[in-house]
């Protein structure tokens, strides 16, 4: 009986340690209950006051539960309060159960600033990250703009508002000339179309050879040949306009008429004509090849450089069609269709647009096109300023010079003088002679300098930006390893699930090897925060 009493008393005493509000080591009953879990709730996968061991981009730290509990809405705060391992894995990139370490593949520099946030409650802007990357990191870790310190909030908001207009500023910062991710994604989407096409890999390689001069040695040779043909075509067109060739063609036409033959058949020099046929054949080959190899026919006809290629060969074929309409392959016909001959001459004049084909091989011309595309507002402002200035000063000059016979007879006639003066060209064909007219001309010239200089500065800054950006893109392609570039292209073709699994295993092994390599240089225990 005594033994049972003692056992009953011992049982009651043990029960009282759990139920009664008796403090133990400064902690209440709730702490004691947490150490003795109930069979209904199960054993917790990690203690609530256990420090959190994290690895962010190779930077290992040990975070205290008390610091994380102050910010339960952040990612690390939710990770600390996770009720199960499955819930915790959804908040991190990887978890090492043996080392009880959470891995995050994020920017390590931002993580160091995040540690300062958990200590002080304020987040400071990092100059090494652009505002968009900084905002993405802050959103990932569960921080908002309210977490920014007062000393950095105004600077962050100002940089975020001015970042879309970074190309308006003459800045040499890397963020102003780095390739845009949208451009890279557009190229990848275009190349991905070859995956489902017939002979897609061969077509993709040929397309890149024709479009990217720095892709390979054949692409460089193709670019050199294309430039040579364009220059030869322009040179032939210029030589054809020389007086010596004009006189030679006129004499040949007279001799043909005397012999009873058509003068149109001998109008062109045979050498220049053969050179023209060769250039047209090459241009036609380029256009047809790019059209057949293009990943998207719709996008092909929307690209400005492709439209230039089409316009460069279109006059030749329109001339042939006009010759057929005139009833003769040489372009002659009856008197009733004589006016079509002048249309043929207009078509021949359109050959001058072939010089624009050099834009495909010239960084400066492509940068100029991009500048004009993004400067339509500034160009409109420039034209508006010129129109207002020309109208005002032309009226003043007409009033001052209308009594003199110097060419200022009407206001529309004065517009030519005002335009030439405001653009500071000054042909001198029409000049004022009165004192009032000279004062008006002086004001027109000075006003033109001020009016033209304002928008031109903005346009020049944009051109500098696009030129540096294009150079950076070309340097990235030129300095990149060819095999790495092939691997990048192969990635858009689509890979099997087994290949993806192998890639993930290789990445995991590489990351583990990196951690093992870094382990000896790190302290035995991560720093506690």
UniProtKB/Swiss-Prot annotation:
The keyword Electron transport does not apply. GO terms for biological process: action potential; potassium ion transmembrane transport; potassium ion transport; protein homooligomerization; regulation of potassium ion transmembrane transport. GO terms for cellular component: membrane; perinuclear region of cytoplasm; plasma membrane; voltage-gated potassium channel complex. SUPFAM superfamilies: POZ domain, Voltage-gated potassium channels. Residues 240-270, 323-340, 399-411, 432-438 are extracellular. Residues 502-514 have a biased composition (Basic and acidic residues). One of its GO terms (molecular function) is voltage-gated potassium channel activity. InterPro entries: BTB/POZ_dom, Ion_trans_dom, K_chnl_volt-dep_Kv, K_chnl_volt-dep_Kv5/Kv9, SKP1/BTB/POZ_sf, T1-type_BTB, VG_K_chnl, Volt_channel_dom_sf. Keywords: Cell membrane, Ion channel, Ion transport, Membrane, Potassium, Potassium channel, Potassium transport, Transmembrane, Transmembrane helix, Transport, Voltage-gated channel. Coiled coil: none annotated. Residues 494-529 are annotated as: Disordered. The chain crosses the membrane at residues 218-239, 271-293, 305-322, 341-361, 377-398, 439-467. Pfam families: BTB_2, Ion_trans. It is a multi-pass membrane protein. It is found in: Cell membrane. A motif (Selectivity filter) lies at residues 424-429. Belongs to the potassium channel family. S (TC 1.A.1.2) subfamily. Kv9.1/KCNS1 sub-subfamily. PANTHER family: POTASSIUM VOLTAGE-GATED CHANNEL SUBFAMILY S MEMBER 1 (PTHR11537:SF61), VOLTAGE-GATED POTASSIUM CHANNEL (PTHR11537). This is Delayed-rectifier potassium channel regulatory subunit KCNS1.
